Amino acid sequence: MASLIYRQLLANSYAVNLSDEIQSVGSGKNQRVTVNPGPFAQTGYAPVNWGPGEVNDSTVVQPVLDGPYQPAPFDLPVGNWMLLAPTRPGVVVEGTDNSGRWLSVILIEPGVASETRTYMMFGSSKQVVVSNVSDTKWKFVEMVKTAVDGDYAEWGTLLSDTKLYGMMKYGRRLFIYEGETPNATTKGYFITNYASAEVRPYSDFYIISRSQESACTEYINNGLPPIQNTRNVVPVAISSRSIKPREVQANEDIVVSKTSLWKEMQYNRDIIIRFKFDNSIIKSGGLGYKWAEISFKAANYQYNYMRDGEEVTAHTTCSVNGVNDFSFNGGSLPTDFAISRYEVIKENSYVYVDYWDDSQAFRNMVYVRSLAANLNDVMCSGGHYSFALPVGQWPVMKGGAVTLHTAGVTLSTQFTDFVSLNSLRFRFRLAVEEPSFTITRTRVSKLYGLPAANPNGGKEYYEVAGRFSFISLVPSNDDYQTPIMNSVTVRQDLERRLNELREEFNNLSQEIAVSQLIDLAMLPLDMFSMFSGIESTVNAAKSMATNVMRKFKSSKLASSVSMLTDSLSDAASSIARSTSVRSIGSTASAWANISEQTQDAVSEVATISSQVSQISGRLRLKEITTQTEGMNFDDISAAVLKAKIDRSIQVDQNALPDVITEASEKFIRNRAYRVIDGDEAFEAGTDGRFFAYKVETLEEMPFNMEKFADLVTNSPVISAIIDFKTLKNLNDNYGITREQAFNLLRSDPKVLRGFIDQNNPIIKNRIEQLIMQCRL
């Protein structure tokens, strides 16, 4: 029947040993190679400590002083100080709103007695009485009029030994400096027509942002920095502020050295790294109040971004190292909330991000030196994860944060089904941040780090920007590509596809009709018919079968049969040479050995349930290695697998070995087996449940463990497709004959098909429960 596929795999999986040996010998072969040192070799010299080379810094430093600029009328930007630096007496600056205020600032040299001077202010000649009694300080006088034809009046003064003056538009006021240095302060005048206020300076000036007002005050009181007082500083026209900035080519390829065949290229690149964490959350069995594990998993992310007008396709893999294991135990009762282990990354942990993109820099990244990178920091904050309890309020794990600081960059390799990709591995060290993480409704609080429950905090990805640079030895002909050396790496892409395949397989369980399942289970499915649902199977059947056998050889089922075969060989060697060993089923001494081990366990283990669990673990091996006419659990398992393969769109040649191996181990975990002795039936399940009953009346009787062990040794083991509870329920509600009972006990497929065709709800429900257990 359908379980023939498993028997074929068990019989043929050992035939690939020679192929494995040849492959291992080939991969472990050593080869002597003579290298002719070229112009890039450092032969005959001590080891060289390579420096990082040229790494462009993209940090923008905003200067405090913007200037100096040549005198010219312009619209002073709001929120910026104009710092004037006149060199001779006279009108320094004029400012007006053309409606209610005209301001003209005059500079008077030291030691001037009261006298009348003529100044040109706003295009008109005006006579003003001025004086400066100080012998050391220069005097700025603010002359203001409030009408076009009005007279000027003195409003304020600034005595300065630095000969500097400041003016700013902000908050509908015109601010200036008054008082005496080194204690000059600002003062503001309301302006009626604020938007149209114009300023005309008559000396060189600087522009300082209001955010740097403290620096401006420092200059007014104590003078400009020495660098501004040299003849090398030349004022420029204020129109230069309107020149549009030109983008610098930050991403560049530099030829360091070149010969006829090889050249050294330095690649400087901007980079945007996006990554995310993944996790695995596993619940324990039982009533649903306990969790077994919450751990980090490697996560892949693919994205596009623009670099100098070019769209770059990038791929990252994020993994963690140095995790910290925490646990919580709310009590010993089955209904007490508990987490056996949950992982947290803290200061002693590291985060690795492997980055690759499709740009020219990564095309020949094989022989690399002078690798360096500068990256920004990124903060990762945890989100909420609710532990869904069957009853009561749910505990919630929330909070936790860490900051990732760059700690270095190395080369790494990402391996896919089609190509090996040399990539950059960015290493980040961690620092814990606020907030701490807690588990509500428990004593767990104020712990620091990032737990694995929800490390992405609702974000699709985290992003880091920066630059990297390295020098690569590449072929001089750009059309050539350096071959990438073979490397053994984790196949993250296949694992991602398997996860998608598992999810699709589990969703397909609801689409399998029970009648179709029985039909498939009755077919003699071999390896080729199992593969018939895969595209291009005929061309690749041989290699696919070899891959399936190689993978299946390491499964738990194959290992168990291998151990059993060894024990049978030992038992057979102890039998007289004249005895003919025809099959596993006829070698009674080997199974007697199992019986003896089971009887020894009777005295050691306290409960019959534990004894049944121990012996039932071998019942599948007893059944699978002997031919029986009835349907067994492996027939159903193989039939479900075949039905899902035919419907799946994710399965392919590479995923099939993992699928079949995982199905052999995980499909139908809760199995029950029975042995029949006349009118008595003994039934034992992998969950520790056991029954003994009369076939005629389905009346229970005491379970004799020793007799059960003897029957296992000498009698056929049958899969309890229709277990005792279902059988009794069927008899109580519908009534069955003695012959029907025997046929159901033997798992006769024709009788099962008859009940299903009659749409019997009890039998259909039992088969559907078995189908739902076929999950990856």
UniProtKB/Swiss-Prot annotation:
Annotated region (Spike foot), positions in chain: 510-776
Residues spanned by motif DGE motif: 308-310
Entry's Gene Ontology cellular component terms: host cell endoplasmic reticulum-Golgi intermediate compartment; host cell plasma membrane; host cell rough endoplasmic reticulum; host cytoskeleton; membrane; viral outer capsid
Biological process annotations from GO: permeabilization of host organelle membrane involved in viral entry into host cell; virion attachment to host cell
Sequence motif YGL motif, location on chain: 448-450
Keyword Nucleotide-binding: no
UniProt site positions, description: Cleavage: R231, N232, R241, S242
Record motif KID motif, residues: 644-646
Sorted UniProt keywords: Capsid protein, Coiled coil, Disulfide bond, Hemagglutinin, Host cell membrane, Host cytoplasm, Host cytoskeleton, Host endoplasmic reticulum, Host membrane, Host-virus interaction, Membrane, Outer capsid protein, Viral attachment to host cell, Viral penetration into host cytoplasm, Viral penetration via permeabilization of host membrane, Virion, Virus entry into host cell
Span list, region Hydrophobic: 389-409
Region (Spike head): 65-224
Family from the record: Belongs to the rotavirus VP4 family.
HAMAP family to which the protein is assigned, alphabetical: Rota_A_VP4, Rota_VP4
Note: This strain probably does not use sialic acid to attach to the host cell. In group A rotaviruses, VP4 defines the P serotype.
Protein name: Outer capsid protein VP4
